[in-house]
Design a protein with these regions (language model features):
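General N-terminal targeting signals
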Residues: 67, 79-80, 85-87, 150, ...
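Long, well-structured alpha-helical subdomains associated
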Residues: 55-58, 100-157
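A broadly tuned preference for mixed-charge, low-complexity surface segments
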Residues: 36-41, 80-87, 116-119, 123
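Active-site scaffold of zinc-dependent metalloenzymes
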Residues: 3-9, 14-59, 67-74, 79-80
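Post-HEXXH active-site segment of zinc metalloproteases
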Residues: 73-114, 139
Length: 157
């Protein structure tokens, strides 16, 4: 068995994301990684930005996480059942320009739930596509990201 190519894994994930509707994906973003949807939409694919500072293997893990968000949101009815507080707050914010729900502790906790679930969905997608995931590196990076989300959401209180 030869060396595993995370570059090829990134290409495979990019192709998968393109097929899902993301036609603007970059891997050299100079700010935090994120996924974005079409304006005034909460789940129609638009673009994905991955931080450029990481090695290719970690970029694969970040892209899996961002695509985990896609997996959660692509069926909005299902997303609403899994994360009703986030779905309601974002719907009211984006469609009625009302931010009161986004200021609530329940929303903050629900956002954290989505982050955890996005990592789970990303891992499942990686397994489905046959992407090799080093569990030590995956869990270390995931933990680093989750603690940073906790600090971010905690600072908004």
């Amino acid at each position: 068995m030869g060396r595993y190519s995370y570059t090829k894994a990134l290409e495979l994930l990019t192709e998968w994301a393109n097929n899902e509707g993301y036609d603007d994906i970059t891997f050299d973003h100079n700010d935090i990684s994120y996924i974005d949807w079409v304006k005034k939409s909460l789940n129609i694919p638009k673009k994905i930005r991955i931080e450029g500072k990481y090695p290719v293997e970690i970029k694969v893990y970040i892209l899996l996480h961002e695509l985990g968000h896609h997996q959660l949101r692509k069926n909005w009815d299902s997303f609403t059942k899994k994360l009703p507080i986030t779905a309601h707050a974002e719907h009211v914010h984006f469609f009625k320009n009302d931010t009161k729900y986004k200021r609530r502790v329940m929303y903050t906790v629900s956002c954290m739930e989505e982050e955890f679930k996005a990592w789970e969905e990303g891992y499942k997608l990686g397994e489905e596509l046959g992407i090799r995931i080093n569990l030590d590196k995956w869990n270390t990076f995931k933990s680093k990201c989750l603690i940073s989300y906790m600090r971010y959401y905690g600072s908004k209180r």
